[in-house]
């Protein structure tokens, strides 16, 4: 069952939001992610909903490399909103950097370690001495993957060539290029952090038999090194063709804005998240989402925008 759908069906946006056109921005932009991934799907749905319900005159989603790029787009002013992993959003800010704030936790990201089923790799330890796609530069995956490999006690080498001592050869490829390389045999594994199922992985599974590695044993070390922003989550059986249920590491996805975004836009967007959650869940999703009143405010230590906090208090007491 998709979280938030019951709420969305039972409640419509307050007439004050729908009727309020004065003072709304002409355009809003939502920094998303790579084609074939949940970030861009979610951002496109959010942009359409923002426009449909009059939060802005128009709204559009931006294709980006992922979380780190999105935060940079936000700070530069090129994006109004950004979707980002909690671990990326929670990194220490450089002195003088534009502050970001959360509007809410929107859904769970699942770290996928994808291998070919005939590779003989059945555990993360089997990646030693292999070529591994660790995420596109600017993506949240490119931040999370080195943390996972370090937690597993695996060392890496740059330049795409495995080291003599079993070092993993790091290849900076994102989702689509990484899947192409996996099919071609030029990488042995692909890391990707996204929703379940990720459409591009589903499509790739039609052409080659895939497997996912269990990463849940790394959780305690990850938390010891980086805090409690990581979770143990289950990729359900049937999420991908022929892939059984597998435990992995998850992290929350947050909807972010600049801390100086005007209160009216923030409040109207929060109302949309609460009252129209059903419009924001991709069709391909299994519904393992955070778009519910109980979880929206749990932003993994990233502060809520003051207007968002006020809106949640008004909506839920």
Predicted regions and their residues:
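Bilobed "Venus flytrap"/periplasmic-binding protein-like clamshell domains
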Residues: 27-53, 57, 61, 109-184, ...
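Segments of small-molecule ligand-sensing domains
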Residues: 244-317
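Pocket-lining segment of extracytoplasmic ligand-binding domains
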Residues: 86-89, 95, 119, 157-255, ...
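Short beta-strand-centered segments that line the small-molecule binding cleft or hinge
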Residues: 74, 79-81, 99-107
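C-terminal region of N-terminal signal peptides and the immediate post-cleavage residues
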Residues: 15-30
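N-terminal export signals
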Residues: 1-19
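Solvent-exposed coil/turn segments that connect beta secondary-structure elements
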Residues: 35, 79, 86-88, 106-108, ...
């Amino acid at each position: 069952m998709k979280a938030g759908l019951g709420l969305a069906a039972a409640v419509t946006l307050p007439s004050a939001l729908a009727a309020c056109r004065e003072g709304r921005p002409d355009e809003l932009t939502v920094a998303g992610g790579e084609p074939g991934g949940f970030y861009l799907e979610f951002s496109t749905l959010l942009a359409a909903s923002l426009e449909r319900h009059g939060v802005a005159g128009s709204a559009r989603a931006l294709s980006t490399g992922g979380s780190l790029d999105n935060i940079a787009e936000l700070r530069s002013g090129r994006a109004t909103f950004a979707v980002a992993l909690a671990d990326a959003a929670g990194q220490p800010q450089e002195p003088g950097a534009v502050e970001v704030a959360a509007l809410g936790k929107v859904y769970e990201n699942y770290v996928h370690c994808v291998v070919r089923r005939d590779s003989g790799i059945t555990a993360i330890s089997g990646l030693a001495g292999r070529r591994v796609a660790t995420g596109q530069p600017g993506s949240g995956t490119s931040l999370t993957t080195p943390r996972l490999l370090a937690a597993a006690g695996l060392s890496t080498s740059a330049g795409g060539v495995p080291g003599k001592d079993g070092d993993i050869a790091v290849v900076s490829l994102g989702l689509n290029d990484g899947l192409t390389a996996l099919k071609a045999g030029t990488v042995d594994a692909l890391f990707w952090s996204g929703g379940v199922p990720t459409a591009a992985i589903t499509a790739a599974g039609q052409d080659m038999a895939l497997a996912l590695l269990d990463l849940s044993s790394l959780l305690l070390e990850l938390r010891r090194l980086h805090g409690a922003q990581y979770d143990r989550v289950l990729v359900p059986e049937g999420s991908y063709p022929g892939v059984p249920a597998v435990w992995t590491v998850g992290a929350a996805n947050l909807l972010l804005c600049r801390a100086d975004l005007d209160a009216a836009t923030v409040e109207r967007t929060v109302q949309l998240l609460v009252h129209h959650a059903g419009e924001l869940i991709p069709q391909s999703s299994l519904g393992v989402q955070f778009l519910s009143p109980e979880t929206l405010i749990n932003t993994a230590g990233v502060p809520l925008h003051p207007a968002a906090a006020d809106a949640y208090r008004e909506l839920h007491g």
